[in-house]
Amino acid sequence: MVVSFIGMATQEVPVKANLNIVLKSDTEQLEEVMVVAYGTAKKSAFTGSAATIKNEKIATRQTSNVTNALAGQVAGVQTTSNNGQPGKDAEVRIRGIGSISASNKPLYVVDGVPYDGEISAISTSDIESMTVLKDAASNALYGARGANGVILITTKRGKSGEARVTFDAKWGVNKRGVPNYETITDPATFYELNYSSIYNADLKGYAAAGDLAKANAYANQAMLSSTYLGYQVYSIPQGQQLIGMDGKLNPNATLGYSDGTYYYTPDNWSDEIFENNLRQEYNLSISGATEKMNYYMSAGYLDDKGIVPNSGFQRYSARLKADYQVKPWLKMEGNVSFTHYDSREQDTEGGTSNANIFYASNIMGAIYPMYVRDAQGNIMVDNRGFLRYDYGKPGQDSNGSRNTIPNANPLASYMLDKMKYSGDVVSGKWSADIDIWNGIKAKVNIGVDVNNVRATEMVNPFYGQYSETSGVGGLIGVSSERTFSVNQQYLLTYNKTFNDVHNVDILAGHESYDYKYQYLYGQREKLYDPNVPELGNGIMNQSNNSYSRNYATEGWLFRAQYDYDGRYFVSASFRRDASSCFHPDNRWGNFWSVGAGWLLSKEKFLENQSWIDMLKFKISYGLQGNDNLMFQGGLYRNYYPYQDQYTLANSNGDFSTSLYYKGNKEITWETSHSFNTGFDFAFWGGKLGGSVEYFSRKTTDMLYFKPVAASMGYSRFPENVGSMVNRGVELDLYSNIIENKNFSWNVNFNLTHFKNKVLELSPELNGQLIDGARIYREDESMYQLYLPKYVGVDSETGESLWALVTPDENGNTVTKSYSVASENRFASGDILPKVYGGFGTSVTAYGFDLSVSFAYQLGGRILDYTYQGLMDVAATGSALHKDMLKAWTPENKNTDVPRMNINDQYTNRLTDRFLTSSDYLSLQNITLGYTLPKSLTRKMQIDGVRVFFVADNVALLTARKGLDPRQGYVAADNVYSPIRTISGGISLNF
């Protein structure tokens, strides 16, 4: 008797009176086909390491950039985002840090061809899947461009049957996703703490002389002077002090003060800066397929407004993808997309620029007004109809004077200045598949990416450092960037099965890539019309510049795969690559990989283990190259690192040159040695499945800048010296707990643990201090911190104490001198987390669906620079953290917060005091939907209707309120805050 069922392996059993038959899952019938380098492969035959995210997960995320959807979804993939501005990429790192000075960015491949356009130009609704290739066996064929991993993006295509029309719409609200730090917002408390800082310094010696009344009077006078706070926002009776002898606010003080011309009252700068805004998105697609043709076309619109004024991202997108079986032996495909986007942002985001609105929201003290008010307390309006903003500079607006962000008002800049990026991205691909003879096929892929961006920045002529009163009269800058790239692939494949058990798959080919970049910039001052963002609108101090960059690679590639009876698998690949980044003598490099797999579940000794659906062992090793050397500082790529590069200037009408970059003709490929091994498994009919893998990624001949003597005429020199390794384990689990007609419930979990270690360094770099906090040393992580060790305060004086590495000549183990402490650095922890990953669950029942996803990391450390700024005991107008209320006083000696003292310039220096845990738990997404019964929708001539609610970036739990460790590895402060989006929507299928 033959027993069969869909998705289960057919069994033939003898006929008996009573039978108890258990069918095993048919892993061949349910074989998953995955996208890999230059094609597809059965998951069971794949010997490398890869993970796939399907459209179902991508579509739930409300993001203008698909890289943000990777957070917590894939083992071995870590994302950080130091800019929450809509449209911005997340920084993606796959299996650790591959280089010190070269890029760690992965390669993006869209529909088989490397992609150079903006990732934000790809609509998430067009994406069918994303596959992350993590080891050399899976991505070595991409050569140098795949050294840091590869992310394959596959767009949707039509399905057989009648044409399908899909429309979905989302409407929602964007709001700030991370709260403020817990700062002192009460003006009275703010004055009291600043008073104590000045009083404790006893600048005139009155307190030491016992004249406490004079000490009090002087501290009040100094506090309100332009040297310190510079603003009075309380009214007090004539002859009385704002702060009394007890250090507390005068009980007769009332909030609000007028000097006869202006009225001063504090504003909450964060409340004034941040706003809730609308988000809307619409997508329409039409798709279908016949025996000879497959087509998919789509159009989309996204308006993703930001959470600060005049910021956001707007996108219009369209895609047409079709293939046609021209002849029995010839199939051709065309795939073209066009995107126009407008990004509104400020270039001051990040850092401590006076125009950075996020810096202002963090650091502005609790007493300062945002606006200028007349004597009656009304916000004033200038003769152009603009609100008058307080710049903290007497004579420009009010009579107040502040040291925190002087002569600037970031909100005014956002309201009055205009900055915009407009881009057009065209991505086209043409391919032909030719069936030559008896398993031999040829494939041609040609991809072209064109990216044109125009940026305009206009600084208003009315207020601030470029105002008419400052002698400038406004500024206009316009730039144009154009990139053009062509990728050509010519491939030959042979696929054949012999005697039903020997399967051979061979690939050989040639690939070339050409990239051109052009930049043009112009700037002028003194604007005629503040509403016209064009160069012709300015007449003074004209300046301009332009340059171009060219880059090319060429590669010959080969891959062979063999499997026996679907049980034993071996693979090997080879690529010979050339890069224009290197001198012709060092241009070519050879890279390869080997891999093997064993599908144990098909062996006879396991065939009776009904609980094992699939069990596979895999192992691989390979070499890859990296040519992506960055300029010192890591912001821009150097396309000519083997050449000396100069800047040209005007010297009294003659040419003047200066060495900008010292090249090295001997540098060549940085090489990554990748090892991977592990198991893929599925048990109990899909109740539990996943993978566990061990990886090692060793980088040799590292590209980095070696320090040299100043007498050489330059400070650093690029070389191939040193090595580094990342080793770790990955665990990826899923469980289909319940699966039936009306109800399903599944959960997923992934975890990555890895360690970074520098194995070899040039003697000149070994032990060198990096960015004031890290030291590169052999046998340690490149992110190992070395900081002075803060051990609290002297209980009798309230002064800061730091530890000594070894006792001094008097046997002291601590010091009050920061200069001494700065020479006594301790290993203070590793910035890299020990564990990171994500987990989630989804439930469907009777038309309802609910999914929840989380991301987390554990075991790392982060420098909280914002908290450091908020804990300055010598602050003169900057915001103060609530922890300052714990500062040492004679009545509060049991504390680790030093005594307030305006003269203490060292307590706030960088030490391990400002090092905190980077652990976090983030509720990434909640999606709740309901699909109407088909019996109802068919009456409306609609195939399907789904209504849904989606919330992104819902909650974040960290070691300190306001801290967001997701912004960067080392630290990221004063950057665009992450956005929380809450939306509702509808999806229609016809």
What are the residue ranges of the model-derived segments?
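Switch/connector loops and helix/strand junctions flanking conserved nucleotide-binding motifs
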Residues: 43-45, 141-143, 161-162, 175-178, ...
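Surface-exposed, extracytoplasmic segments of Gram-negative outer-membrane nutrient-acquisition systems
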Residues: 251-262, 459, 463, 467, ...
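Aromatic-residue-lined binding/catalytic grooves and analogous aromatic/hydrophobic interfacial grooves
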Residues: 376, 828, 839
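A surface-exposed, glycine/aromatic-enriched loop/edge motif typical of exported proteins
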Residues: 180, 185-249, 339-399, 512, ...
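A generic beta-sheet turn/junction motif
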Residues: 3, 25, 146, 288-292, ...
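Short, small/polar-rich motifs associated with maturation and membrane association
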Residues: 1-319, 324-327, 331-333, 339, ...
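Hydrophobic/aromatic-rich, well-ordered segments within soluble, folded domains that form packed cores
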Residues: 286-295, 299, 842-845, 920-932
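Extracellular/periplasmic, surface-exposed regions of secreted and cell-surface proteins
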Residues: 58-63, 97, 104-105, 315, ...
